[in-house]
């Protein structure tokens, strides 16, 4: 399922020297969808946010990163908020985020630290978004304003109440 270089079916980059088979993302999503629901116990899981991403992509007809860029980040004037930042910025502009001694065995710079997000190609409902303090501040200001920023409504007040 992995390769040390990009070739053929290995197109999802997990770090500088690790590529994942492109079928892995869909296989994982299929397993999530088919997993039986158990009740009466709590266990932390990213699955809900991954399912939320799948729902958003289905409803919008767009990949999540594209939808968020068009509907939120670009209109909000966010120029440094993106998934897969190495597509847009030089590596020296991206702060290293973690040292992965377990799986990828490298310092992660421009790659999501969360393994489940990394193995979905770096774009996931649970992790993978990179930004800077100023732009995170603008997103939170929009939430504090009940979904509005600079005179434009992005989210309903009810959605903001649920988020916060």
Annotate the PLM regions.
Residues 1-164:
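Short, surface-exposed loop or secondary-structure junction motifs
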């Amino acid at each position: 399922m992995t390769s040390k270089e990009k070739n053929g079916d290995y197109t999802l980059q997990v770090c500088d020297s690790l590529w994942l088979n492109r079928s892995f993302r869909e296989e994982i999503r299929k397993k999530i969808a088919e997993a039986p629901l158990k009740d009466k116990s709590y266990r932390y899981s990213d699955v809900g946010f991954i399912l939320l991403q799948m729902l958003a992509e289905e409803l919008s007809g767009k990949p999540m990163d594209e939808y968020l860029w068009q509907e939120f980040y670009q209109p909000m004037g966010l120029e440094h908020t993106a998934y897969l930042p190495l597509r847009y910025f030089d590596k020296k502009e991206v702060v290293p985020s973690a040292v992965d001694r377990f799986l990828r065995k490298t310092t992660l710079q421009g790659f999501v630290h969360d393994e489940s997000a990394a193995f979905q190609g770096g774009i996931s409902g649970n992790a993978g978004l990179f930004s800077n303090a100023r732009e995170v501040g603008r997103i939170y200001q929009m939430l504090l304003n009940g979904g509005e920023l600079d005179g434009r409504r992005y989210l309903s007040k009810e959605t903001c109440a649920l988020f916060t």
